Amino acid sequence: METVRISGKKRLSGEVRLQGAKNSALPLLAAAASVDGVSVIKNCPRLSDVDAAIKILRFIGCRVWREGGAVTVDATGICRCDVPRELMCEMRSSVIFLSPLLARLGMAEISAPGGCEIGLRPIDLHLSSLRLMGAEIGTEGGVLSCSCPDGLHGEKITLSFPSVGATEN
């Protein structure tokens, strides 16, 4: 790893407040669904993708509320394993709800993720990795039906190319 060293006559000190990042907040919100309890995500940004994730959490039975910059997710009431297309289409990374639903309920039904200005976001790495961990996955009419009758298990997975998104599931 490369290091940059800055030398000067005065020592730097102080604090810097960083804004919350969408790419961290979204996987944390989805992961909250895998816990039979309450999760608090602090410094959570106010963005449309975060709002879409909160809608999905509420739809599947979570209680979600904001206080200042924190989002609290009470996932004790999860009762649905399906996420309707209109909610999935609100954010491109909505596929990150697949693993928490599988782990928690043993099944999940989702449609392909939502749009992105960059272009199509394939989810084949997500699906092949989940299959290696014991998931059974079928598709019909654009809907992924997933189950893991024997539960998900750990597995050594080698991705065919580097992918941050595939590791979030």
Feature map (PLM): residue ranges:
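Structural preference for solvent-exposed beta-strand-turn elements
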Residues: 1-169
